[in-house]
Design a protein with these regions (language model features):
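N-terminal export signals
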Residues: 1-18
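Low-complexity, Ser/Thr/Pro/Gly-enriched N-terminal "stalk/linker" regions
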Residues: 17-100
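Well-ordered alpha-helical scaffold segments within catalytic/enzyme domains
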Residues: 43-56, 104-117, 176-191, 270-289, ...
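Extended, well-ordered alpha-helical scaffold segments
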Residues: 63, 117-133, 190-210, 279-310, ...
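Active-site-adjacent bridging/hinge elements
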Residues: 72-85, 148-157, 242-254, 424-430
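Aromatic-rich carbohydrate-recognition surfaces in CAZymes
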Residues: 95-231, 446-460
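Extended ligand-binding clefts on enzyme/binding-domain cores
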Residues: 99, 135, 139, 143-146, ...
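C-terminal capping/lid segments that line or modulate ligand- or cofactor-binding pockets
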Residues: 156-162, 167-169, 177, 333-354, ...
Length: 471
């Protein structure tokens, strides 16, 4: 499975064939055999065959073939349930489904649905399953494949039922679901996913967002954990640091699953603005729920205005920038974390143009030593976060840097670094040591693998000559 390297040949027949034999052996596909793959998509197999000849760099080509189908190869459980598709997707080396990860894991496959009906059913099944999950608990981030319980059952929170794996409140979990459903609908025009249950789930989403604006008090959600990692629990008996209600939405935890320091996490609020506008369009067009659609737009506009008023500040070096977290009282956090949504990813998720002046200032800040979680070493440079500790770079940040520029040399540099920091495994990882890429975390992390594949596809489509050259 993900992360297993293929050993080079220990005996070579002759020096004249050495380079050929080493290459032939080193870059053998690390995908499971066809009979061991969890799901096979004809369209995905076709795109892999089409793209490989367009990548000159042999190792990068090999990594694309390993990474792009990794979610389908290794993480999918697909079946029919009550005559509707039902899909459960684990993260990789953790056998639970995160709303965030599972949505992102299938995202690059969506444009291929037009050529593969089975793939479309699989993604519809994921939307159906996620809808069930949200109805169980909109505050949870990760779910079991049934009422199996979890080793986090001892967490101190209000609603830890057996279907939940982890109940950390993160805005982006709900946003990722809306993003997935909206894009599925946009590409297929299929409205079968928009059931009465889906609408009820979306009413729950909006209700949860509004509750976490904290206008009527601290709400109904708290979370604390008996642990030796401060970032795994919230302060003040699980309610988090105080916030002043200014229109922003509290997120108790970040997309890294680490506790927020100040409750208003700006990248996730940006994502909420985009998602609420998408939700409004669906509710208006598909359901004809005009009043609810207006409610979604009004909430999006309120959050957006609050981001611009309370979520930016003047940095002494970089100028006007976005804060990472604020509390509405005037306190803020100047940093970025690699996980998506991040400040770096704002254009990727549709909040702003990558040419926006405030974004460009922010980008310069977070990709520099002005960001306490920017690391640079012998192996590479990029953004990390407190989840795995100091001096560990997340490949996800390097991928996102490439997604948010039109500078071909910058993209080339990112691709080269991604190629050279796989620890010779052929896969992406959660993070790697800035001084030694062979020291990495999570050998089987499907989200990062698929995101890397998505980047390669974008480069092939947008800058085809770049991959036909030596990096």
């Amino acid at each position: 499975m993900g992360g297993l390297a293929v050993a080079a040949m220990s005996v070579r027949p002759s020096l004249s064939f050495a380079a050929f034999r080493e290459s032939e052996t080193k870059f053998v596909s690390l995908r499971p055999s066809i009979d061991k793959r969890r799901f096979v998509s004809r369209a995905v197999e076709v795109i892999i065959k089409e793209v490989k000849p367009k990548i000159k760099d042999e190792k990068l080509r090999w990594m694309f073939e390993n990474c792009f189908p990794n979610t389908l190869d290794t993480t999918v459980r697909y079946k029919m349930k009550n005559d509707r598709p039902d899909t459960f997707i684990i993260t990789g080396d953790i056998a639970a489904m995160w709303l965030r990860d599972s949505s992102a894991q299938v995202w690059p496959y969506l444009p291929l649905m037009k050529d593969d009906r089975d793939l479309q059913f699989l993604i519809a099944g994921l939307i159906n399953r996620q809808t069930e999950c949200i109805l169980i608990d909109p505050y949870a981030i990760a779910f079991n494949d049934g009422p199996l319980g979890s080793y986090w059952e001892t967490d101190h929170t209000q609603h830890m039922v057996k279907e939940l794996h982890e109940r950390k409140w993160e805005i982006e979990s709900l946003c990722y679901h809306i993003r997935l459903a909206y894009q599925y609908w946009t590409l297929t025009k299929d409205t079968s996913i928009f059931s009465a249950d889906w609408h009820e789930a979306m009413k729950l989403v909006v209700r949860t967002f509004k509750e976490q604006q904290r206008k009527q008090g601290i709400g109904t959600y708290s979370f604390s954990r008996d642990c030796d990692r401060p970032t795994d629990s919230q302060i003040n008996n699980g309610w988090g640091a105080p916030v002043k209600p200014v229109g922003l939405i509290v997120s108790s935890f970040r997309p890294s699953d680490d506790a927020t320091q100040f409750g208003f996490l700006i990248p996730s609020n940006m994502f909420a603005v985009v998602s609420l506008r998408q939700l409004s369009e669906i509710e208006h067009t598909v359901y004809n729920h005009i009043d609810f659609a207006k409610e979604c737009i009004a909430l999006a506009d309120e959050v957006d205005a609050a981001i611009r008023r309370y979520g930016t500040f003047n940095h002494p070096i970089c100028g006007r920038v976005y804060a990472f977290e604020v509390d509405g009282f005037g306190n803020g956090l100047c940093m970025d974390d690699a996980n998506i949504p991040s400040l770096l990813s704002a254009p990727y998720l549709g909040y702003c143009s990558f040419k926006d002046a405030v974004y460009q200032n922010t980008r310069k800040l977070i990709w520099s030593d002005n960001n306490p979680y920017f690391f640079k070493g012998k192996a590479g440079e990029g953004i990390g976060g407190p989840h795995v500790g100091l001096n560990y770079i997340w490949p996800m940040s390097i991928i996102m840097k490439a997604f948010t520029t039109d500078d071909e040399e910058e993209i080339r540099s990112c691709l080269k670094q991604l190629r050279d920091t796989d620890g010779e495994t052929g896969f992406m990882h959660e993070s790697f040591n800035a001084e030694n890429a062979a020291d990495f975390t999570r050998p089987w992390f499907a989200w990062a693998n698929t995101l890397f594949g998505e980047l390669i596809l974008k480069v092939v489509q947008t800058y085809p000559n770049l991959l036909l050259q030596t990096l």
